[in-house]
C-alpha cells in the first residue's frame, strides 16, 4: 500500500524557526509545506554532511579505522564527488570501488564478516546450492536462515530500527559480530556444512567438496590445492607454516605423492566409494579447518 501525507496549515507554526549553533543559527522563514525542503537544503549545504555520509560508506566497505591520511586523501575526495553529483551515492561508490586504495593489500581483511556474509561465503565459494524438491529446498534454506540467526543476524529481523550494532556502534563496529558465543556458532556451522549429517527428508545437504576440489587448477597436487583454496577463501595470503599445517591434513601427514596417487585412483573410477570416500573425507577435514581460521572470517 502507498503511504501518503498531507499538509495541515491550521496546525503549522508559521513563525520563523532559528536553528542551533550547529547550523550557524540559520533561520527558516515561513514557507508552509516547503519549509521541510528548505531545512534539508540547510543541512546538505553543510560541508560536514557530505563528509559524515562518506565516512559511513568508507567504514561499511573498507575499514572502520579512518586515519588522518584516509580522511585527507580518500574521504575528502569522496565528499567532493558527492556534492558535485547532487548527493547521488552511485558516483561516490564508483570512485571508491575503482580506486587503488580500495584494492590495497593493507585494507584487505580489515572487516569481520557478518553472519550472513560468513554463511554465504561458505556456500558460494564452493558453488553449493540446494537442488531438491520444493519442500526440502525450502526447509534447507529456512534452516540457513536459522543458522545465521544463531550467529547473531536474523535476516530481516534487526534488533532495532538502527539495524545491527556492528554496522554503526563505535568504537568496536564489526568486532561486535564476534564473542565467545557467536564464534562457537560459526564453528558449529562449519562442522555442519562439511559433514554428511545435515539431512532433510532423506536429502543430505552439504558442501560437495569433491566437486569443489575438481574445479581447482591442479587437484592432484597437494601444495597447489592448498594454494588455490587460500586464494579462494582468504582475502590475503597466509604464512607458509600455516599452509604446511593445512596440507598435512589433506595428505593425512603422508608425503605429497600419496595424495597424488589417491586422487588419481579416484579420477580413474570416480563412482567407486572405495576411492571417492577417502578423497571426500580429506577435503571435508581441510575445509572444516579453513572455515574456522581467523582469515576466513574477515574480508
Language model: regions and residue ranges:
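Non-catalytic, conformational "gating/processing" segments within enzyme and secreted inhibitor domains
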Residues: 1-68
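Flexible, low-complexity segments enriched for small/polar residues
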Residues: 46-85, 93-299
Amino acid at each position: 500500500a502507498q503511504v501518503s501525507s498531507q499538509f495541515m496549515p491550521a496546525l503549522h507554526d508559521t513563525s520563523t524557526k532559528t536553528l542551533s549553533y550547529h547550523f550557524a543559527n540559520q533561520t527558516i522563514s515561513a514557507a508552509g509545506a516547503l519549509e521541510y525542503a528548505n531545512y534539508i537544503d540547510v543541512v546538505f549545504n553543510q560541508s560536514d554532511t557530505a563528509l559524515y555520509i562518506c565516512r559511513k560508506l568508507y567504514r561499511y566497505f573498507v575499514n572502520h579505522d579512518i586515519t588522518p591520511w584516509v580522511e585527507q586523501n580518500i574521504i575528502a575526495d569522496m565528499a567532493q564527488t558527492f556534492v558535485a553529483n547532487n548527493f547521488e551515492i552511485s558516483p561516490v561508490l564508483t570512485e571508491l570501488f575503482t580506486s587503488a586504495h580500495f584494492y590495497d593489500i593493507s585494507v584487505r581483511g580489515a572487516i569481520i564478516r557478518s553472519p550472513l556474509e560468513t554463511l554465504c561465503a561458505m556456500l558460494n565459494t564452493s558453488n553449493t546450492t540446494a537442488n531438491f524438491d520444493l519442500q526440502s529446498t525450502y526447509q534447507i534454506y529456512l534452516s540457513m536462515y536459522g543458522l545465521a540467526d544463531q550467529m547473531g543476524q536474523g535476516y530481516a529481523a534487526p534488533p532495532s530500527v538502527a539495524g545491527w550494532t556492528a554496522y554503526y556502534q563505535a568504537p568496536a563496529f564489526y568486532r561486535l559480530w564476534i564473542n565467545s558465543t557467536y564464534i562457537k556458532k560459526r564453528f558449529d556451522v562449519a562442522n555442519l556444512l562439511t559433514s554428511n549429517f545435515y539431512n532433510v527428508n532423506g536429502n543430505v545437504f552439504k558442501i560437495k567438496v569433491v566437486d569443489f576440489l575438481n574445479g581447482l587448477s591442479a587437484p592432484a597436487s597437494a601444495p597447489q590445492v592448498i594454494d588455490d583454496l587460500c586464494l579462494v577463501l582468504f582475502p590475503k595470503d597466509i604464512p607458509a607454516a600455516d599452509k604446511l599445517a593445512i596440507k598435512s591434513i589433506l595428505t593425512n601427514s603422508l608425503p605429497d605423492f600419496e595424495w597424488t596417487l589417491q586422487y588419481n585412483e579416484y579420477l580413474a573410477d570416480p563412482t567407486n566409494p572405495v576411492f571417492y570416500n577417502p578423497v571426500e573425507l580429506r577435503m571435508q577435514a581441510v575445509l572444516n579447518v579453513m572455515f574456522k581460521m581467523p582469515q576466513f572470517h574477515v574480508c
